[in-house]
Amino acid sequence: MEALVYTFLLVSTLGIIFFAIFFREPPKVPTKKAK
């Protein structure tokens, strides 16, 4: 049970980091295209 909770926490943290990076990258592309 503890292992499951730890895995869920790890996946959640990884997902949040991945989402933050994915959301931060796209804005850089349109900015370059606008210029």
Swiss-Prot record:
One Pfam match: PsbT
Cellular location of this protein?
Answer: Plastid, Chloroplast thylakoid membrane
Bilayer topology reads:
Single-pass membrane protein
Q: Name one GO cellular component term.
A: chloroplast thylakoid membrane
UniProt keywords (A-Z) are: Chloroplast, Membrane, Photosynthesis, Photosystem II, Plastid, Thylakoid, Transmembrane, Transmembrane helix
Top-rank taxon = Eukaryota
**What InterPro entries does the database record attribute to this sequence?**
PSII_PsbT (IPR001743), PSII_PsbT_sf (IPR037268)
Gene Ontology annotations of biological process type: photosynthesis
Transmembrane portions of the chain: 3-23
Family as reported in the entry's similarity comment? Belongs to the PsbT family.
Q: How does it assemble?
A: PSII is composed of 1 copy each of membrane proteins PsbA, PsbB, PsbC, PsbD, PsbE, PsbF, PsbH, PsbI, PsbJ, PsbK, PsbL, PsbM, PsbT, PsbY, PsbZ, Psb30/Ycf12, at least 3 peripheral proteins of the oxygen-evolving complex and a large number of cofactors. It forms dimeric complexes.
Task: Summarize the protein's role.
Answer: Found at the monomer-monomer interface of the photosystem II (PS II) dimer, plays a role in assembly and dimerization of PSII. PSII is a light-driven water plastoquinone oxidoreductase, using light energy to abstract electrons from H(2)O, generating a proton gradient subsequently used for ATP formation.
Spell out the protein name for this chain.
Photosystem II reaction center protein T
Q: Which organism is it from?
A: Cabomba caroliniana (Carolina fanwort)
Query: Its encoding gene is what?
Result: psbT
